[in-house]
Amino acid sequence: MKLSRRDFMKANAAVAAAAAAGMTIPTVAKAVGETTNAIKWDKAPCRFCGTGCGVLVGTQNGRIVASQGDPDSPVNRGLNCIKGYFLPKIMYGKDRLTQPLLRMKDGQYDKEGDFTPISWEKAFDIMELKFKNALKEKGPTAVGMFGSGQWTVWEGYAALKLLKGGFRSNNLDPNARHCMASSVVGFMRTFGMDEPMGCYDDIEEADAFVLWGSNMAEMHPVLWSRMTSRRLTNAHVRIAVLSTYEHRSFELADNPIVFTPQTDLVIMNYIANYIIQNNAVDKDFLAQHVNFRRGATDIGYGLRPTHPLEKAAKNPGSDASEPMSFEDFKTFVAEYTLEKTAKMSGVPEDQLESLAQLYADPKVKLVSYWTMGFNQHTRGVWANNMCYNLHLLTGKISTPGSGPFSLTGQPSACGTAREVGTFSHRLPADMVVTNEKHRQIAETTWQLPAGTIPEKVGLHAVAQDRALKDGTLNAYWVMCNNNMQAGPNINEERMPGWRDPRNFIVVSDPYPTISALSADLILPTSMWVEKEGAYGNAERRTQFWRQQVPSPGEAKSDLWQIVEFAKRFNVEEVWPAELVNQKPEYRGKNLYEVLFANDVVSKYPLSEIPDDQLNDEARDFGFYIQKGLFEEYASFGRGHAHDLAPFDVYHQVRGLRWPVVDGKETLWRYREGFDPFVPKGEEVRFYGKPDGKAVIFALPYEPAAESPDQEYDLWLSTGRVLEHWHTGSMTRRVPELHRAFPEAVLFIHPLDAKARGLHRGDKVKVISRRGEVISLVETRGRNRPPRGLVYMPFFDAAQLVNNLTLDATDPLSKETDFKKCAVKLERVVA
């Protein structure tokens, strides 16, 4: 048998991956598919973070038996992180759910009953009853859905159609509200369009990298490996890392900066001031491409209106701004001097100045990266805007090696939550429900009566919790997330609503998570390559995969669940007479027929799917539903700088970065020569704005919603670790990953521990104004907080750190600040 170099690489990687996962591959021939019982290989994007690494999935006898990094993927070039290497094992936890479970007592549904196996028909029977009762008694605002940045593109699109077009409810929001909403609003305010203008190719072009609240070494390790290579093979390259505590990314930092929580706002205004004072402004760029505006201040903290902080705010939730001049902006940032910034932030002056010099030096190509440290912030939108300010002042934007780049944490937070528009205020391709023209476009595309989509923004994630608690949201479907563990302020604002007898909660999940066990009905869900899918990663790259194995037992995909459930509702049951009268041909039809089996979605026959190719959903519905939904969805953005390639193209390539025009992807947006939507001769055009100009915002420092005081004397920051992803519902079922980091710990400065009589390994009670949790003291290891701050990951279901966190949000993005609340510690005596 003769092997090519590529086949040899694939074979070696397959053997290594299989061995690491505790499996065996008898011969190299199995990896390259040359024996009768060969492993079959196919491509897919990784199931975890928003990097979008490509993997090759090895299947045999209906199971995944191996995976490896895809050497043909331009994202990861054959490399995986530790989670990626164990992808097969996330599918086969011993407690995988395989049939619907309903709380029952004496053969009937009972809110306090035990989970009992039922059929899909009976599951949909009780769902139908509860959703119809809510719609009949209170109307569309009484039903809602909490979705996911892990949904495939067509799962999110189907949910959007069912909720906003079918049930006429804008109460659809994704868990990306907790991670990317501030980035979305920041992009929209500054540029008028969402998502980064650059791409991962910037890493190999840049001279400097600045990480703002981003531990790329653990959260985006494959991108970090590319950045590490750039830094270590080019002596002039510099890396600055800013965080409220030291972490693994600090190990490569030339300028490691630990700042006082919330003072990143101060630091960015100082850098803007430094750029201006040192004549480093690109004046020609500003004159041609930038406007200046002063933003509203004292905007509150997204708490309930009765909260003292909301009552005290002068402009709660205000997104208002007014024009100003460059000279006005210069005056505004002038107060953020080096001395003042050092005092407020706790950062030495020389480090601040060194950081500012990177931005100011016209010879230095620079990329700013950020993740949750910016976004999970009560002024997260401002933080995003202020970072854009620095790139716009210097013209370091939309060009190879320079630009601001928001990294995403979920595999399709961009492709599904943002681009499809599964937020409570959005529609596809940056359209919004508050815009009449946008609603008309959606209604026309979906062949719905005019006026079907409500104009009022629906309930965002935290507002959904509050509405459940208040009894105004009564039928609620949670899909592809574990929000009971991941969301803030569990005790006060989430659990009461879920267990309220007025409400019926459905959770679709592969595993019995905290959320599933808190629900009334659990629906078993297909995972990853048990269905055909598409994700969109952080660099605007859309990637497809085919179904490669069947789902276990009676598990069904989220797409199947949404579309099948739509059959239970006739249009007369969900639309008022005036809407039905506009479309008399819809009388007697159900939402499945109107939304999913219409002449656009259903026109692609099963004959387009090879006979030997798995596609359970398509064969159940009788047409190529994924293709139909994608092509209908893609029509929203084509010709409007959100262009996607034809469906079939994506199955042949390792993803394409939109806009895709005439078969060519776009690496850098808004720059002539790279972006087909920039007219010839304009050089740069931020075409999301009517005048083609981006906006620099004057925004001040404002304090956090909650800070340490005499009683609650420590900052608490929460986050993740390398080995686990989000709430650990997948990674904790991988024995190797679980053993590597079996339980959450409380990272604390040794002197803070000593002052409280605590030692490494001690049990400690962490207490906030909202709840408490018992953890273990860790004074060493990868995370090294400064005095006055503790850090705790949220993957451990036995240590619900979100019992402690405050449900304060950015008033503009409605994204929760998981990085700043006040706690105190008590030693637990055995």
From Swiss-Prot:
Residues in 4Fe-4S Mo/W bis-MGD-type domain copies: 39-95
Post-translational note: Predicted to be exported by the Tat system. The position of the signal peptide cleavage has not been experimentally proven.
Domain of life: Bacteria
Location(s) in or outside the cell: Periplasm
EC number, as in UniProt: 1.9.6.1
Cofactor(s) this protein requires: [4Fe-4S] cluster; Mo-bis(molybdopterin guanine dinucleotide)
UniProt name for this protein: Periplasmic nitrate reductase
Source species of the chain: Yersinia pestis (strain Pestoides F)
